[in-house]
Amino acid sequence: MSPLALVSVSDKKNIIPFCTELVEKFNYKILSSGGTAKHLMEAKIPVIKVADFTNSPEILGGRVKTLHPKIHGGILAKRTDEEHKKDIEAYDLELIELVVVNLYPFKKTVEKGSKWEDAIENIDIGGPSMIRSAAKNHKDVSVLVDPSQYQEFIEESKKGELKETYKAKLALEAFQHTADYDTAISNWIRKERGLQSSKYIESYPLIKTLRYGENPHQKAFWYGLNNIGWNSAEQLQGKELSYNNLLDLESALSTVLEFGYEEKDELTTETFASVILKHNNPCGASIGNSASQAFLNALKCDSVSAFGGIVAFNSNVDSETAINLKDIFLECVVAPSFDPEALEILKIKKNLRILKFSKDQIPNKNQTSTKSIMGGLLVQDTDNIEEKTESWITVTKKFPSTQDYLDLSFAWKICKHIKSNAIVIAKDQQTLGIGAGQMNRVGASKIALQAAKENGYGGVLASDGFFPFADTVELANEYGINSIIQPGGSIRDEESIEMCNLKGISMVFTNKRHFLH
């Protein structure tokens, strides 16, 4: 007796050659409905229509096609169970050996910004039911949910009876497929209706098993979305990305995105930006009138820490920039585009990872960030609030000069991406000194100011949190700081304001804090 395969797919990739092999090499009968049945019949593949098989028509505009005892009985029946055998005979059930189903393209539908009603109609009901039934009864039934599985199924079938371990793997992938589908639907409803969910559910496919985590003794895996973010970035050269590379690339790119992001020379001359990053903290950043100048200025801040670092650009990398990059040991360079001549120069360094991250691969701003804690997960909105400089308040008698204001804005954007407590000293829109990850603000200030002293004198100071005391202002004055930007909000703000007035320093409150842990 010929085995029966139920085939109902939205993604019709490779379905014709696959079903042809099922019929011609393994003597399968094909059971199908709707668009899939039509597609197969047009290719001259014999098909039994579901409506004929169940003796029940599609109803409710196609909403009900396969939700029928003849379908699910044929899938769920346990072949060796005596009670099931009686039902099989009593209800004349024909056993289904293979279920090939993938689902309505719900994710693609909502990504296009479809209407609520259109999205609802793209919620598959029959498909997940068949997949789950087959996966539950995987001892007797095989289930395929993705075209990438077809060839492996053919090869396994050539060996004879399918192994239980292979069928169990198919069942696992099937349940993960429906879980991912339901996650997409529930998250869409939550976002569309602005609802607070009682459960946090996300679904990310495995991209790659990494060599190790932060340290060689730690296992690590990379999960992500297929069409956006780092998985869609194009690696033009270099060894595979490590766990630490990915963390640093994320921080570097997030920082440089503060200044716009264009593949070609569409930026204004004031917004070519470069960031050098090490151990998840910027160690140098600058805006210049070219990518090359921005990089060289960023390098001046801390050329020692730049060794083995990550460099990010917000504009095209040309040959001049590549020449400046090639003499420094770097782990990765990321930019929206690279000139062919620049790539030739950079590829001389065989181990350098070169990544092209296009503008359209940047996720939208409505993202969340997560951190694992013992027994749980912390979830928050990403810190990507748009800063409105018109809401900033100068709280001192002295106002920042035009140049100081530009530097304050620049330093504030960089400070947001540095581990707290964070202090940034900047002048002419380049960092002179950075104090990161210190347990007190004065300690971070000392590190940043001392580094700045080696790179120049004066400039502005940015702090990611408020000043609990006036001591940071006093210290800043000793190093010639002209202006300060900070959130404000301390019960001792007046002390810091008075000290600024006494020392002739201007100070701006943003009313926004940017802690980063």
From Swiss-Prot:
Record flagged with keyword Transferase: yes
GO cellular component, one term: cytosol
Catalytic activity: (6R)-10-formyltetrahydrofolate + 5-amino-1-(5-phospho-beta-D-ribosyl)imidazole-4-carboxamide = 5-formamido-1-(5-phospho-D-ribosyl)imidazole-4-carboxamide + (6S)-5,6,7,8-tetrahydrofolate; IMP + H2O = 5-formamido-1-(5-phospho-D-ribosyl)imidazole-4-carboxamide
TM segment ranges: none
GO molecular function per UniProt: IMP cyclohydrolase activity; phosphoribosylaminoimidazolecarboxamide formyltransferase activity
GO biological process, one term: 'de novo' IMP biosynthetic process
Span of domain MGS-like: 1-145
Pathway note: Purine metabolism; IMP biosynthesis via de novo pathway; 5-formamido-1-(5-phospho-D-ribosyl)imidazole-4-carboxamide from 5-amino-1-(5-phospho-D-ribosyl)imidazole-4-carboxamide (10-formyl THF route): step 1/1; Purine metabolism; IMP biosynthesis via de novo pathway; IMP from 5-formamido-1-(5-phospho-D-ribosyl)imidazole-4-carboxamide: step 1/1
Alphabetical list of InterPro entries matching this protein: AICAR_Tfase_dup_dom_sf (IPR024051), Cytidine_deaminase-like (IPR016193), MGS-like_dom (IPR011607), MGS-like_dom_sf (IPR036914), PurH-like (IPR002695)
CDD domains linked: IMPCH
Statement: the UniProt record of this protein carries the keyword Hydrolase: yes
Enzyme Commission code: 2.1.2.3, 3.5.4.10
PANTHER family the record matches: BIFUNCTIONAL PURINE BIOSYNTHESIS PROTEIN ATIC, BIFUNCTIONAL PURINE BIOSYNTHESIS PROTEIN PURH
Entry comment, domain topic: The IMP cyclohydrolase activity resides in the N-terminal region.
Family of the protein in this entry: Belongs to the PurH family.
HAMAP family: PurH (MF_00139)
Name of the protein described by the UniProt record: Bifunctional purine biosynthesis protein PurH
Provenance organism: Prochlorococcus marinus subsp. pastoris (strain CCMP1986 / NIES-2087 / MED4)
